[in-house]
Amino acid sequence: MKKKIAIIGAGIAGLTLANLIKKYTDHEFMVYEREESLSLEEGYGIQLAINSIKILNQISFDKISNEKIFHPKTIDFYNIQNEKICDLNLSKFNSTEAKYTTLQRSTLIEFLKEDIYTQYLRFGKKIKEVSELKDKVLIKFDDNTNDLVDFVVAADGIF
């Protein structure tokens, strides 16, 4: 039976879930983001461990240009006096299907929003109230709109 899912938050977790639902199910879904747009500033880098890469590869992350990602071989650890404590050989965790990866957060968000951006994403949707009804969940937003869904996934770090 087809269900209706509300995903709260258009960050990495929310957009990843939206892509997976779109690819593997016929459920109806919508991503609600409280901000007016996605932050795509070049900004900071993130690290993705092997298990997260395996999940992302299910939605074609492995097609991202190698110019936009980096596969470090080791990570060095330092104490507060800037003295090296040890290093970790990351290549030992890599496999043919997934490698430890670093990239800019904006690159990952750009990739994740490609297939869902206009049709499945609503901006400026600040939640005012969530009410559990008999067999549904009612979400009320600050803009006086609402949505009645079967499931709510909180993927917003400030929810």
Question: What is each PLM-predicted segment?
Answer:
Residues 8, 32-33, 155-156:
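Active-site flanking residues adjacent to catalytic metal/cofactor-binding acidic residues
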Residues 13, 37, 159:
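Conserved Rossmann-like nucleotide-cofactor binding loop
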Residues 16:
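Conserved SAM/SAH-binding loop-helix junction
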Residues 1-13:
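Beta1/beta-strand and adjacent pyrophosphate-binding region of the FAD-binding site
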Residues 22-42:
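Glycine-rich FAD pyrophosphate-binding loop
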Residues 45:
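Glycine-rich active-site loop/strand segments that organize a redox cofactor
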Residues 3-5, 22, 49-159:
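Conserved N-terminal helical subregion
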